[in-house]
Amino acid sequence: VGFKAGVKDYKLTYYTPEYVTKDTDILAAFRVTPQPGVPPEEAGAAVAAESSTGTWTTVWTDGLTSLDRYKGRCYNIEPVAGEENQYICYVAYPLDLFEEGSVTNMFTSIVGNVFGFKALRALRLEDLRIPPAYSKTFQGPPHGIQVERDKLNKYGRPLLGCTIKPKLGLSAKNYGRAVYECLRGGLDFTKDDENVNSQPFMRWRDRFLFCAEAIFKSQAETGEIKGHYLNATAGTCEEMIKRAVFARELGVPIVMHDYLTGGFTANTSLAHYCRDNGLLLHIHRAMHAVIDRQKNHGMHFRVLAKALRMSGGDHIHAGTVVGKLEGERDITLGFVDLLRDDFIEKDRSRGIYFTQDWVSLPGVLPVASGGIHVWHMPALTEIFGDDSVLQFGGGTLGHPWGNAPGAVANRVALEACVQARNEGRDLAREGNEIIREASKWSAELAAACEVWKEIKFQFEAMDTL
C-alpha cells in the first residue's frame, strides 16, 4: 500500500553511530553549529542527508533505489572543546556518489546546498579523507617534486622566487626587464601576480614574449635553468589553453593558474595539458580566504590543498608562518605535509582529522610568500625544509640598490642558511647570527639587512585549532 509520506527526522535514517567506515568511503569532518533547539545528532544527520541522498520529505522514488547503499552517514559526533554548541560531525560517503576524476563533482555534493541549510547556524568542512580508490581516478600534479627538480637541475635547497611588482601598470617591456634582473641576480623563478591576466596596459602575448626573452638571456648568462610563472588564467577555458600552448611554443618551463577563481574544471584541464606537454604548473590560491578564513563557517585550507593535489598543480601558495599572511605553524605544516608526502598520519594537534594515503600521487611544492625578507630566511629554511619555494616580492624588488642586488641578497642568505644547516647549526637559535656573518662578505645582503631589520607583521593568527 503506497509509502509512508510525510516529514521525518533526518536522524532516523542518517545518524548511524554503529556504522563501521569502509576503506573506499570518502570521510568528512564538519564543524557544525546547530541553531538553538536543534540537537547535534539531528544537525549531523541533516548534513549527511543534504550532502548525499536526502531531501526535506520522504519521496515515493526512495523505493526505487537502495538508500542503504547510497546514503551518506553521520557516524560520530564529538563536542568541540572550549566552544559552546559546536560539534565535529564525521560523515561517511559511499564512493559511488562521486564522478571519477572530478573535484568539481566532489565539492558540488559535499559542500553544495548544505551550507545554506536553515537548521544550521554555521558549518565548516575541516578535513576530508580521500580513499586511494578515488584518488587513483585523478592524474594529480602534472609532474611532482622529484620530476621538477630533475627538470630544473636544482637539488638540496628550497627554490627562490619573486612576484613582479607593481603588480599592475607596467608595460610588457619594463615587466620583462624586472624579470631579467631578478633571474640574473640569482633567483630560480619570477612570478606573474595573480591579478595579471591580459589587461589594456599589458596584453598577455606581449608579456609572454618579453618574459621568455628575459628567461633565455638570464639562463645563458648564469648557466642555471630559470623560469617565470606565466599566468594563463583567462575568462574562458579555451583562451586559457591557448595561452598555455603559446607558452609551450616559446619553450618556457612553467605556467600559472589561479585555481579557485578559475575553477576546478579549468584547473584540471590545464593540469592535463601541462603533463602532456612538459610544462610545470604553478598554482595561486586567490580567493581562498573568502572560503577558509572564518573559523566556524566555510572550508579549511587543508581541504582546498587536498583538492588541488587531486586536480593538479606543481606549486601552491601555502602561507608563511612568519610574514604578512595567515598561518599558524603546526596547522600550516599539517597541510604542507598533506601536499608533499605520500602518507600522512591523523594528528589532531596539527588539524589533521584523518590518516591520508595518497599512494603514488605526485606531491606539490608549498610556496611561502607574503611579507617575507632576508631576516626570515633561517626560519623559512627550518620550517619548510628543502622541498619548498620561498617567494620574496617586496623582499627582492624593495632592495635599496634595485632588483638584481635584491635577488643576490636573497640567494646569498639562502645559501648561507642551507650551508649552516648542513653543518649541523641550529637555524632557529642562530639564524640572525648566520645572516650577519654572510652579510660581511655580501654588500647586497648587508644593505638588505639594514633596510628590513625592524619589520614585523604582528597580529594574532586567526587559524587556531
UniProtKB/Swiss-Prot annotation:
Sequence positions that bind Mg(2+): 191, 193-194
Keyword Lyase in annotation: yes
Pfam families: RuBisCO_large, RuBisCO_large_N
Site-annotated residues for Transition state stabilizer: 324
Residues that, per the record, bind substrate: 113, 163, 167, 285, 317, 369
SUPFAM superfamilies on file: RuBisCo, C-terminal domain (SSF51649), RuBisCO, large subunit, small (N-terminal) domain (SSF54966)
Keyword Coiled coil: no
Keyword annotations from UniProtKB, A to Z: Calvin cycle, Carbon dioxide fixation, Chloroplast, Disulfide bond, Lyase, Magnesium, Metal-binding, Methylation, Monooxygenase, Oxidoreductase, Photorespiration, Photosynthesis, Plastid
Reaction equations catalysed: 2 (2R)-3-phosphoglycerate + 2 H(+) = D-ribulose 1,5-bisphosphate + CO2 + H2O; D-ribulose 1,5-bisphosphate + O2 = 2-phosphoglycolate + (2R)-3-phosphoglycerate + 2 H(+)
Main location: plastid
Cofactor(s) essential for the protein: Mg(2+)
GO biological process, alphabetically ordered: photorespiration; reductive pentose-phosphate cycle
GO molecular function per UniProt: magnesium ion binding; monooxygenase activity; ribulose-bisphosphate carboxylase activity
Enzyme nomenclature, EC number: 4.1.1.39
The record's account of how the chain is modified after translation: The disulfide bond which can form in the large chain dimeric partners within the hexadecamer appears to be associated with oxidative stress and protein turnover.
GO cellular component assignments: chloroplast
Positions of post-translational N6,N6,N6-trimethyllysine modification: 4
Modified residues (N6-carboxylysine): 191
Localization, UniProt: Plastid, Chloroplast
Cofactor binding note from Swiss-Prot or TrEMBL: Binds 1 Mg(2+) ion per subunit.
UniProt record similarity statement: Belongs to the RuBisCO large chain family. Type I subfamily.
Function field: RuBisCO catalyzes two reactions: the carboxylation of D-ribulose 1,5-bisphosphate, the primary event in carbon dioxide fixation, as well as the oxidative fragmentation of the pentose substrate in the photorespiration process. Both reactions occur simultaneously and in competition at the same active site.
Name this protein carries in UniProt: Ribulose bisphosphate carboxylase large chain
Organism: Acer saccharum (Sugar maple)
Gene: rbcL
